[in-house]
Amino acid sequence: MKVFRRAWRHRVALGLGGLAFCGTTLLYLARCASEGETPSASGAARPRAKAFLAVLVASAPRAVERRTAVRSTWLAPERRGGPEDVWARFAVGTGGLGSEERRALELEQAQHGDLLLLPALRDAYENLTAKVLAMLTWLDERVDFEFVLKADDDSFARLDAILVDLRAREPARRRRLYWGFFSGRGRVKPGGRWREAAWQLCDYYLPYALGGGYVLSADLVHYLRLSREYLRAWHSEDVSLGTWLAPVDVQREHDPRFDTEYKSRGCNNQYLVTHKQSPEDMLEKQQMLLHEGRLCKHEVQLRLSYVYDWSAPPSQCCQRKEGVP
């Protein structure tokens, strides 16, 4: 009876405590629901985005001008084909940003809705490999796609021509695809921005598609996501990707139409991706495509190209010669 009398005497405090406990529990449950997948009315998981070709553009927090140029040229709605042809995001690391930079990105996201913000990652060259792996992991978890084009925000891509090429492929040529402009004779850099102090495999990098733009099939992206905890990251994301896929049974397709080296080889109407383009270069190419149906006002070759010789050792793979785009 004493217990009941004490409980009655403190009934108000106990009641308030119970309400607080219930409120805390409800808030916790609401938070859990918001952090997980939201089920649909049928109890199934929320539908994933769908696209034949996903496009992930690596961009820096302050590169607004470049993103604007890409949005108004090769990633403009009229360049994306039909429904569910192309899905695109600009990937930006936001770790360590100040409040003003974060606010600017939030406003840009509110306006365009095409940013993939990575809060756990500080956007810097030394983190580029981790960034690309995070981009691909996010994509595999949230989008149903067949292929992904990874590009830089200073690259210009012909999505129409890329879509035509991919759709024309037989099923066997769509699986485990690693498509771009390959290098097999890249010497390990001992210093400078591209220094790889931890590289111990050999005196050359393993064959890799240059990072200005390349295409991967969805099955390889899925493999990378599942393996990510075991993958060693080097400074260069393209070198890292080539190394990660070296022991895998993939279809490596070297294509000179990917002008994706550290500087452009010029302008050729056959090019699918052209790297190292200024916003002005992109606008000029877009206008040429709209009014002339071709990429270049005048074709020009600034550097020789090559066809990769897969029958030769990697160090002898890539002999530049006339007549190759």
Curated annotation (Swiss-Prot):
Q: Which UniProt keywords apply?
A: Glycoprotein, Glycosyltransferase, Golgi apparatus, Manganese, Membrane, Signal-anchor, Transferase, Transmembrane, Transmembrane helix
Single GO MF descriptor: galactosylxylosylprotein 3-beta-galactosyltransferase activity
Give me the Cytoplasmic side stretches, as residue ranges: 1-11
Q: Which cofactor names does the annotation list?
A: Mn(2+)
Q: Which Pfam families match?
A: Galactosyl_T
Recorded topology in the membrane: Single-pass type II membrane protein
Kindly report every residue range on the membrane side named Lumenal.
31-325
Q: Which BP terms from GO are recorded? A: chondroitin sulfate proteoglycan biosynthetic process; dermatan sulfate proteoglycan biosynthetic process; glycosaminoglycan biosynthetic process; heparan sulfate proteoglycan biosynthetic process; protein glycosylation; proteoglycan biosynthetic process
- The EC number(s) this enzyme carries: 2.4.1.134
An example of a Gene Ontology cellular component annotation for this protein is: Golgi cisterna membrane
Listed under catalytic activity are: 3-O-(beta-D-galactosyl-(1->4)-beta-D-xylosyl)-L-seryl-[protein] + UDP-alpha-D-galactose = 3-O-(beta-D-galactosyl-(1->3)-beta-D-galactosyl-(1->4)-beta-D-xylosyl)-L-seryl-[protein] + UDP + H(+)
Q: Pathway, per Swiss-Prot/TrEMBL?
A: Glycan metabolism; chondroitin sulfate biosynthesis; Glycan metabolism; heparan sulfate biosynthesis
Q: What family does the Swiss-Prot or TrEMBL record give for this protein?
A: Belongs to the glycosyltransferase 31 family.
Q: What is the name attached to this protein's record?
A: Beta-1,3-galactosyltransferase 6
